[in-house]
């Protein structure tokens, strides 16, 4: 029973304990308060804060999720959730959570500060991880050979290690899906083997024993099934024998595509022996071939309804549900077909039906998306989004652009507009995905290149920004946005290369870039960088070689190489 007054009293006691650092007592008071008012989102937020202060981050995360589920538009809930994920070192998840909160309140200082902090930690952690990983690969001949075979090997290995760090409890599941070379790299990175209970030989023996047991069980099931079938044949009535004769004739007609004749034989079989569910199953198949889908549905439903009178087996009923699903698919009644497949799986959970269900769900989603397309309505939502954008209401602008894209997913301008809204919301990676999609749809769309350049500039990827602006200028040499962006970026690179200060954030980001790592790990470039360090004026020697000059430009733009 809800008692808000008691909940409020307990909350105040919990707050007092929290302020005094008595977090265990605070947890008790907040938990008791929730018992009295289980729909008060603030209580779950306070409980999450108390758990986090005790270092009990899993419980803090659970409470924060409950808070958000009750009140999705309350920014503090996202602060609590992000804090718990931060404590669990789920930095990428924390970043996403803070971004979710900023969608609701873009100017929330606490969310902005938390996002900045977690991003910096994430970049630093990645940089340290990459440096350690590269050192292991370079000093291990086997791993180094894998890198030579596949230049993407370090990146794949890094992603696997990050997955393990985020979900240590799932390490065996993660490794079971990896290529053996990746698993080897993971083991060398962590310094021990993940072999399960016992050694590899014992594990193989255990698997062999299990396989042998499965084989024997399957053989026993098949033997029993044959015995049951034989018993059935010996106990068959004259009606069953006569009914099967008509069924076999119907099957022959069916193979010859003589469906009228086949239908007649199956109906004869049913008339003689109405309790054999498979006669109805065959009859439904004929109706489907004759495109009499209503009759096929009627036949299947009748047989399923009388399954107990027919003493039908589970697998037989599952087959009827599958046939019912096919009938509904042909009638474009996808929801009913999906329901039929799901009921089939209850009777007999097999791979073929699971695959058919997944394929149907994909088909339904695809057709619904296609049916939803309406360029006129897309234009309406785009215009609404533009109005919101002009009024600096960027979350609602994004929502309108989302709907416009659903209505017309092949319009490059819509992705560009949404990228602009996402940029204002500081969701640079998502905005970059949108401009890349816009360019994919229209490679001549200059505005998309200028926005791509701006995003790389904001993300301090100055060389990539220059490339984007340059591509836009190739398409339109007089484009004002690309010209100004290029000049701004070139000035920033020049200023940065001559400055004594180092932009730590940009430096960490650059060192985590696989392209930069490849350049600085190249032996030839290491010699060049050493010479430039001794004599900066020697850079003129390398400008003539396009490959070397291109690499040097990238290092300068990345803030790694200074030119004074």
Curated annotation (Swiss-Prot):
Organism: Plasmodium falciparum (isolate 3D7)
SUPFAM superfamilies cross-referenced by the UniProt entry: TPR-like (SSF48452)
PROSITE patterns: TPR, TPR_REGION
Keywords for the protein's UniProt record, in alphabetical order: Chaperone, Coiled coil, Cytoplasm, Repeat, TPR repeat
Region feature Disordered, mapped onto this chain: 199-247
InterPro entries for the chain: STI1/HOP_DP (IPR041243), STI1_HS-bd (IPR006636), TPR-like_helical_dom_sf (IPR011990), TPR_2 (IPR013105), TPR_rpt (IPR019734)
Coiled coil among keywords: yes
Record remark on domains: The TPR repeats form 3 domains; the TPR 1 domain is composed of TPR 1, 2 and 3 repeats, the TPR2A domain of TPR 4, 5 and 6 repeats and TPR2B domain of TPR 7, 8 and 9 repeats.
Record's protein name: Hsp70-Hsp90 organising protein
Domain STI1: 513-552
Gene that encodes it: HOP
Gene Ontology annotations for the cellular component aspect, listed alphabetically: cytosol; protein folding chaperone complex
General function of this protein: Acts as a co-chaperone and mediates the association of the chaperones HSP70 and HSP90 probably facilitating substrate transfer from HSP70 to HSP90. Stimulates HSP70 ATPase activity and, in contrast, inhibits HSP90 ATPase activity.
Domain of life: Eukaryota
SMART domains: STI1, TPR
UniProt subunit comment: Monomer. Homodimer. Forms a complex composed of HOP and chaperones HSP70 and HSP90; the interaction is stronger in the absence of ATP. Interacts (via TPR 1, 2, 3, 7, 8 and 9 repeats) with HSP70 (via C-terminus); the interaction is direct and is stronger in the absence of ATP. Interacts (via TPR 4, 5 and 6 repeats) with HSP90 (via C-terminus); the interaction is direct.
Description of what induces expression: By heat stress (at protein level).
Coiled coil: 197-239
Predominant subcellular localization, coarse grouping: cytoplasm
């Amino acid at each position: 029973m809800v008692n808000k007054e008691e909940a409020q009293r307990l909350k105040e006691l919990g707050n007092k304990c929290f302020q005094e650092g008595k977090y265990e007592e605070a947890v008790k008071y907040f938990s008791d308060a929730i018992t009295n008012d289980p729909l008060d989102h603030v209580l779950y937020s306070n409980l999450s804060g108390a758990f986090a202060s005790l270092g009990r981050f899993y419980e803090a995360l659970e409470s924060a999720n409950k808070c958000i589920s009750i009140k999705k538009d309350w920014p503090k809930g996202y602060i609590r959730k992000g804090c718990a994920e931060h404590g669990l070192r789920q930095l990428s998840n924390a970043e996403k959570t803070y971004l979710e909160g900023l969608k609701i309140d873009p100017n929330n200082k606490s969310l902005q500060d938390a996002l900045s902090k977690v991003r910096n930690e994430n970049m630093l952690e990645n940089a340290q991880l990459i440096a350690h990983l590269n050192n292991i690969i370079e000093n291990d001949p086997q791993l180094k050979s894998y890198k030579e075979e596949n230049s993407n090997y370090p990146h794949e290995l890094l992603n696997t290690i990050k997955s393990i760090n985020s979900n240590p409890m799932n390490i065996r599941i993660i490794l079971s899906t990896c290529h053996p070379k990746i698993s080897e790299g993971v083991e060398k990175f962590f310094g021990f083997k993940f072999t399960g209970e016992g050694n590899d030989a014992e594990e193989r023996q255990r698997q062999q024993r299990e396989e042998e047991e499965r084989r024997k069980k399957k053989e026993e099931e098949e033997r029993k099934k044959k015995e049951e079938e034989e018993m059935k044949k010996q106990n068959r009535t004259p009606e069953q024998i006569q009914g099967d004769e008509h069924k076999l004739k119907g099957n022959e007609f069916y193979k010859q595509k003589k469906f009228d004749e086949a239908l007649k034989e199956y109906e004869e079989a049913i008339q003689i022996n109405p309790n054999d569910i498979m006669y109805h199953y065959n009859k439904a198949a004929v109706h489907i071939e004759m495109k009499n889908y209503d009759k096929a549905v009627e036949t299947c439903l009748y047989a399923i309804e009388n399954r107990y009178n027919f003493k039908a087996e589970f697998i037989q009923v599952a087959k009827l549900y599958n046939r019912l699903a096919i009938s509904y698919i042909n009638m474009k009644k996808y929801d009913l077909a999906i329901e039929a497949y799901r009921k089939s799986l209850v009777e007999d959970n097999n791979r073929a039906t699971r695959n058919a269900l997944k394929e149907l769900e994909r088909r339904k989603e695809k057709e619904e998306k296609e049916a939803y397309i309406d360029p006129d309505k897309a234009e309406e939502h785009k215009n609404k989004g533009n109005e919101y954008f002009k009024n600096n209401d960027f979350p609602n602008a994004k929502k309108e652009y989302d709907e416009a894209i659903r209505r017309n997913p092949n319009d490059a301008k819509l992705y560009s507009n949404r990228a602009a809204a996402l940029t204002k919301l500081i969701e640079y990676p998502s905005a970059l995905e949108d401009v890349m999609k816009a360019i994919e749809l229209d490679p001549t769309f200059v505005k998309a290149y200028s926005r791509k350049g701006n995003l790389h500039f904001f993300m301090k990827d100055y060389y990539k920004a220059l490339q984007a602006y340059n591509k836009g200028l190739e398409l339109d040499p007089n484009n004002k946005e690309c010209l100004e962006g290029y000049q701004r970026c070139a000035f920033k690179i020049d200023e940065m290369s001559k400055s004594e200060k180092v932009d730590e954030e940009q430096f960490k980001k650059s060192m985590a870039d696989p392209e930069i790592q490849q350049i600085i790990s190249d032996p030839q470039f290491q010699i060049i960088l050493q010479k430039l360090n001794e004599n900066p004026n020697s850079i003129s020697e390398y400008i003539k070689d396009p490959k070397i000059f291109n690499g040097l430009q990238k290092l300068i733009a990345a803030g790694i190489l200074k030119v004074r």
